[in-house]
From Swiss-Prot:
Domain KH type-2: 39-114
4Fe-4S is among the record's keywords: no
Protein name: Small ribosomal subunit protein uS3
Compositionally biased tracts (Basic and acidic residues): 227-243, 251-260
Keyword Plastid in record: no
Assembly mode: Part of the 30S ribosomal subunit. Forms a tight complex with proteins S10 and S14.
Species classification: Bacteria, Bacillati, Cyanobacteriota, Cyanophyceae, Nostocales
Record-linked InterPro entries: KH_dom, KH_dom-like_a/b, KH_dom_type_2, KH_sf_prok-type, Ribosomal_S3_C_sf, Ribosomal_uS3_bac-typ, Ribosomal_uS3_C, Ribosomal_uS3_CS
Length: 260
């Protein structure tokens, strides 16, 4: 079951949160759901992968309070969203108000993605961009996995489907590094799907990222230390005796100067 079901929907209320957090009267639910879809579609058109200024939008979360809409935009390049002097975010707010009609109160909060190479949607977006430039899919997938491993994840699985490298017959190939426990509910798994439009047709990209297990009472999965951090810690430990020797030499030198 864990292999087939959507990993995020399977864990809603356990380790994952809803992307839309609001309640409404039953008669208004269809209208508000359409509004949410329009908001996300507009932001994707203006700042997404196919836009002129790609801001690397990872996720858009929507909250509603009375007649106010709160948007949390998680992006890899917050400077592109905010713009010079806040002009970009004001233009985005004006466009969204025009889209919804009326003078709606819209508050936009821009959040920077801390680990870009560990975000499933941004990884899938990177692979799609490279495939559209006719780069070999094996090379792109290997590069994306290496970048994700350097970001400190515990496991990743990438699946690409379609006419790979322009083959006559479509096929599906996938690669996995590390652990990706899809059956474990406490596993913090980030999943995303993206499409690449090539001259041979559409390629589908699926990415699963395992960031660690969330223990009850613990909000965020603690990532394991990256090899670079371990090397840095080992280097610090190696440098400590040298520092002590240098301090001892300085003290001895100072003692000699005081005696003289």
């Amino acid at each position: 079951m864990g292999q087939k079901i959507h990993p995020v929907g399977f864990r809603l209320g356990i380790t994952q949160e809803h992307q839309s957090r609001w309640f409404a009267e039953p008669s208004r639910y269809p209208e508000l759901l359409q509004e949410d879809h329009k908001l996300r579609q507009y932001i994707e058109q203006k700042l997404g992968r196919l836009a002129q200024n790609n801001a690397g939008i990872s996720e858009v979360r929507i909250e509603r309070k009375a007649d106010q809409i709160d948007l949390e935009v998680r992006t890899a390049r917050p400077g592109v969203v905010v713009g010079r002097g806040g002009q970009g975010i004001e233009a985005l707010r004006t466009g969204l108000q025009t889209l919804l009609g009326g003078n709606r109160q819209i508050r936009i909060n821009v959040v920077e993605v801390q680990r870009v190479d560990a975000d499933a949607y941004l990884i899938a977006e990177f692979i799609a961009q490279q495939l559209e430039r006719r780069v070999s899919f094996r090379r792109v997938v290997r590069q994306a996995i290496q970048r994700a491993q350097k970001a400190g994840i515990q496991g990743i699985k990438v699946q690409v489907s379609g006419r790979l490298n322009g083959a006559e017959i479509a096929r599906t190939e996938w690669t996995r590094e590390g652990r990706v426990p899809l059956h474990t509910l406490r596993a913090d798994i980030d999943y995303s799907y993206c499409t690449a439009k090539t001259v041979y047709g559409i390629l589908g990209i699926k990415v699963w990222v395992f960031k660690g297990e969330i223990i009850p009472g613990q909000e965020v999965a603690t990532p394991p230390p990256s090899p670079r951090d371990r090397d840095r810690d080992r280097g610090d430990r190696d440098r400590e005796p040298r520092r002590r020797q240098q301090q001892r030499r300085r003290q001895q030198f100072e003692d000699r100067s005081n005696e003289g």
